[in-house]
């Protein structure tokens, strides 16, 4: 099974993907359309799709499963690219985790987060992601926003202190993943800017450990430009991870194949990452659709990877001097035409 690589690229050239990408086909309006493939059996499917770096939640690979997961990863020559605690699946987190109004739930969330740090290190991942999941509100004044912000500061500071104390220079870094809505009507840390502000308020000793995991679809759901979101993270030195997919306008989170909806913007994103010499993992957060049968469940990864390889190669051929020239003369329509020529 050959690994798909993005080359030439600084740093990590393999592609990442989550075990949840190969799910059972549920959505809010319908049950499963495929059998639930056991998590460790999904790893070989990811390997067959050319993936190098695996991603998983703690509810998918718990601490008790870490030894078995490491054996499977080793057998297929894979690595753990990212690990993340689920602060949304368990009903106890129905009103949030770190921002819950229930102190017992906040205590449980912190315990789970610290256990996830241990699992991240044990699995050999360098990055642990926090997705804002159910951190938010559906009714006005259901939570005090200022209290919620302070609770997040307290929680993330505790995670940072734990990682520094127990793992020192071997501590993973933490990437906060913004999303504006879904499953909550209004979510805290809804944009890259909010995440960067929160990081600036963490204890100074913890700030270097925290960055951002921007996702294409989440930026588009917020009506924002994901290229600028990524550039902002790069400018702040906080692009710790990235999730690639596609999103058809400001609708529900679709997790469509990368390169499908806005290929010119995806081409431009590759240009930005190349020029920044970014060394992290290019990872997919996509979802096999309900209509795909089990035999085709990895098609979304094959399609995303093929699109990424093509776009990356085309981006390498974009003449940066021409782009600079169009900028200097403010010939933006001509620039758009040039990029279309590079793409098509």
Predicted features and spans:
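Residue-level detector of anion-binding/catalytic polar loops
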Residues: 52-53, 79, 126, 279
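Aromatic- and acidic-residue-enriched carbohydrate-binding clefts of CAZyme catalytic domains
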Residues: 35, 39, 82-89
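Histidine-acidic metal/acid-base catalytic patches
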Residues: 1-50, 74, 140-141, 154-164, ...
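Glycine-rich, proline-tolerant flexible connector loops at the mouths of alpha/beta enzymes
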Residues: 53-73, 132, 138
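Glycine-rich, aromatic-flanked loop segments that form ligand/cofactor-binding clefts
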Residues: 12-20, 61, 66-87, 119-124
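Short loop/turn segments at strand-loop or loop-helix junctions that form parts
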Residues: 17-23, 85-87, 130-135, 176-179, ...
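Active-site acidic/histidine proton-transfer and metal-coordination neighborhood
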Residues: 2-7, 75, 79, 92-211, ...
């Amino acid at each position: 099974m050959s690994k798909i690589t993005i080359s030439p690229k600084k740093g990590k050239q393999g592609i990442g993907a989550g075990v949840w990408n190969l799910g059972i086909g549920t959505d809010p309006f319908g049950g499963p359309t495929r059998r639930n493939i056991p998590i460790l059996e999904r790893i070989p499917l990811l390997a067959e799709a050319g993936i190098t770096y695996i991603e998983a939640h703690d509810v998918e690979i718990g601490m008790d499963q870490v030894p078995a997961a490491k054996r499977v990863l080793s057998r297929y020559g894979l690595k753990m690219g990212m690990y993340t605690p689920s602060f949304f699946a368990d009903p106890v987190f129905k009103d949030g985790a770190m921002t819950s109004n229930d102190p017992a739930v906040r205590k449980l969330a912190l315990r789970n987060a610290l256990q996830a740090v241990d699992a991240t290190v044990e699995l050999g991942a360098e990055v642990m992601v926090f997705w804002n999941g159910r951190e938010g509100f559906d009714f006005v004044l259901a939570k005090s926003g200022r209290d919620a912000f302070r609770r997040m500061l307290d929680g993330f500071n505790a995670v940072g202190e734990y990682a520094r104390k127990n793992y020192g220079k071997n501590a993973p870094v933490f990437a906060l993943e913004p999303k504006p809505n879904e499953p909550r009507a209004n979510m805290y840390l809804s944009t890259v800017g909010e995440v960067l502000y929160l990081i600036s308020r963490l204890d100074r000793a913890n700030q270097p450990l925290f960055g951002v995991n921007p996702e294409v679809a989440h930026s588009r759901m917020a009506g924002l430009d994901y290229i600028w979101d990524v550039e902002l993270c790069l400018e702040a030195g906080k692009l710790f991870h990235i999730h690639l997919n596609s999103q058809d306008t400001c609708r529900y989170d679709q997790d469509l194949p990368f390169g499908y909806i806005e290929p010119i913007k995806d081409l431009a994103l590759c240009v930005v990452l190349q020029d920044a010499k970014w060394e992290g993992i290019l990872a997919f957060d996509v979802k096999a659709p309900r209509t795909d049968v089990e035999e085709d469940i990895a098609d979304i990864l094959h399609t995303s990877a093929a699109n990424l390889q093509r776009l990356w190669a085309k981006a390498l051929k974009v003449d940066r001097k021409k782009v600079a020239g169009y900028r200097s003369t403010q010939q933006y329509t001509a620039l758009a035409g040039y990029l279309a020529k590079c793409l098509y």
